[in-house]
Swiss-Prot record:
Species this chain originates from: Enterococcus faecalis (strain ATCC 700802 / V583)
Protein name as catalogued: Galactokinase
Annotated compartments: Cytoplasm
Task performed by this protein: Catalyzes the transfer of the gamma-phosphate of ATP to D-galactose to form alpha-D-galactose-1-phosphate (Gal-1-P).
Gene Ontology biological-process annotations: galactose metabolic process
Amino acid sequence: MEELLMNRFVEIFGEKGTACYFAPGRINLIGEHTDYNGGHVFPAAITLGTFGVARKRDDQKIRMFSDNFKEVGLIEFSLEDLTYSDSDDWANYPKGVLNYLIESGHNIDSGLDVLFYGTIPNGAGLSSSASIELLMGTICNDLYALHCPMLELVQIGKKVENEFIGVNSGIMDQFAVGMGEKDQAILLDTNNMHYEMVPAKLGEYTIVIMNTNKRRELADSKYNERRAECEEAVRLLQKELSIEFLGELDSETFEQYQALIGDPALIKRARHAVTENERTLLAKQALTEGDLEEFGLLLNASHRSLKEDYEVTGIELDTLVACAQEQPGVLGARMTGAGFGGCSIALVPKQNIDAFIEAVGQSYQDKIGYAADFYPASIDDGARKLF
């Protein structure tokens, strides 16, 4: 792959690239819709991601090309004008990184040429945008010798998303992409950014990512709706409880005080936030102890809660997950990401992968009318220079 990209770089830019880089995508193992509820998330970097080949220029020109968006063509802009532009399309993500690195006082004194190529399916909810942001940060850090800590690049990536692009997302995606380690999941407390690396040794099992191939049109509007519902539940609970987030409660306390919320729909939303946070902490314990069966059961329980209490799944995700859970040897499956399309994950015996993909794929095609895509993935290192 790297050699192909080095040759492709010469085709596009006419000269050899000086180095090759990679930034992964991410999955969230468990802890869904907990980040804005003051809970824990449990992401991991994966083997799918974005490759980049780059070289510095001796002028102020930035030139970017993505083999995933060939139709957009070569995108050019100047270091002296790093404002958002619709015509720059996907390149606004790396452009934003350049903008905030310079704004933070880092010395980027000349332009560069960059070729991007991603193996993350677009729109699948596996953080292709965070992957591009951290890839660009890693390229700049290396080529301009910025000595910028990864955590700062993570925060710049989030700033690009929130302020440059205008998407109201948390820090989990960039954190996982930047800080990921091979065979380690990251338990992140979204309240205070405390994190710990947890061994995720899956032994004879592998994670299969299942893409519904359903466009996530509803995700943004429903995401904002759920967020508002949780905030309202907190406001009602605050009549008797001094809490700021649902993630501060355990199930027992929640059950004791849920009558304060009144509205049955709001109770369900809040119950998911509370129980999912508990499941995430139990999942950490299960992985630490090497108890993959328990970990799988927690994945199943998470999906059930997202389906019944949080109501963010939909027929496509439910079909994939239900069928996956029925396959021989599968320990667990759940949707991952915002929901309403996107992806789910399953913990599948390595020896059964082909049979699993065939059976679940056929069942999905029969019921939904179009194909799902399947990607076996391992937990891998974060953004890095390859050579």
